[in-house]
Amino acid sequence: MCDKDRFKVIIVGGSVAGLTLAHCLQRAGIDHVVLEKNSDLSPQVGASIGIIPNGGRILDQLGLFDAVERMTYPLSIATITYPDGYSFRNNYPKTVDERFGYPIAFLDRQKFLEILHTSYPDPSNIHTNCRVTHIRRHDSHMEVVTSSGQEYTGDLVVGADGVHSVIRSEMWKLADALEPGRVSKREKRSMKVEYACVFGISLPVPGLKVGDQVNAFHDGLTIITIHGKNGRVFWFVIKKLDDMYTYPDTVRFSSADAVRTCENIVHFPLVNGATFGHVWENREVTSMTALEENIFNTWYADRIVCIGDSIHKMTPNIGQGANTAIEDATVLTNLLYDRLSKNGHKKLARQELLQLLREFQSQRFRRVNKIYQDSRFLVRLHARDGIVKSLLARYIVPYMTELPADLASKSIADSPTIGFLPLPSRSGPGWLQWSRKQRRPATPWILVLLVIVVSFGLHSPELVIPTFWSNSLVSKTVE
């Protein structure tokens, strides 16, 4: 079969979503290219990345998890602190590891991207300095055009270009042309910004033990520190803004804003005598950004589809942003592999491809929306946003000792895997025990607690019970 007759994917964006998709497609034998606007595939911008079992298992299928594990130290204990000096410890990270056979672990985002691109077997498929400006639609294919005038032809364009996605905008234009009104003005302005984050990486700090995590809850602000391999501290300062912004008319931050935010909280305590000031003094890199929140309703149009942050964006509190992007790449590849392996990897008819993309959104939307809603609630719970959430965080959460591990387990257990690759030998009982079909009704005391919580907040507009609370309070897994 001639190359021109083979189905080809153009991936726009060479970060977590795009490079993971490239690995998946490579293993599936599906032709593809990656177009990345920057010259460096793994820049150091001060960010870290958390790999949770649902992402870790997929990376293991791709033969990448061993490299990740060598650069990380598994989390085992989380300490939660409050402004009144109260604190408690919870071993939910260790419990999650034991249940699923994979740890919760953090590393430099730069190092993770290095793993993805240096282990990719065919570098000629990855093109840097390719800033995509627009897409031309033809009856039989799509043409992607870059700022330098280069043209790339393919059958499916995948937008993996992040929250400021050019491909999402091009997809909207195409949808408006083919089906006027399909993407409403409301959807185009549905991404909001209510929080900002200063994130960074610091050298080891005395008192911050390797493998531990600290969540310091304050009014309108949360400090999260994760103590990784060799004592390196990955940290986030997440604060509520005075105003809500609507994307793209959002707020931008300078290095001076980051300094001002952090220097105002240097006296905030963490654990074992360490303060945030010690973390700040030992910083290596830092940056500040707005935290966009949204899950869009339109994920595809014609021969364009978006994955990862380009179509669903959540705060870092839940640690699932990168992992859901890895899942997106997995599900899209599974669907393509199922179709193409049956026709010899020939081009798909337009209607056949549209059906595939409908199936992709259908499979992903419900799961991602649940994780997104959980993330929305957690960022506000952590920041003690309002009296009800303040009371929940302070007087109820500390006494529901199994809740963090149970919530994490529910979001992990039903995650997808690469269907055409064998499952890894390492595993744990949690994949089966915490899947939806294995859950049974909760114990009565949990239902009583739910009644108390709801009764307290019945007349408060601030109380919105998220999906993970409602599910965890009315169902529990068979152990």
From Swiss-Prot:
It is an enzyme of class 1 (oxidoreductase). It is found in: Membrane. FAD binds at E36, G50, R109, D309, A322. InterPro entries: FAD-bd, FAD/NAD-bd_sf, FAD_mOase_fung. GO terms for cellular component: membrane. Keywords: FAD, Flavoprotein, Membrane, Monooxygenase, Oxidoreductase, Transmembrane, Transmembrane helix. Belongs to the paxM FAD-dependent monooxygenase family. This is FAD-dependent monooxygenase atmM. It comes from Aspergillus flavus. The lineage of its organism: Eukaryota, Fungi, Dikarya, Ascomycota, Pezizomycotina. The gene is atmM.
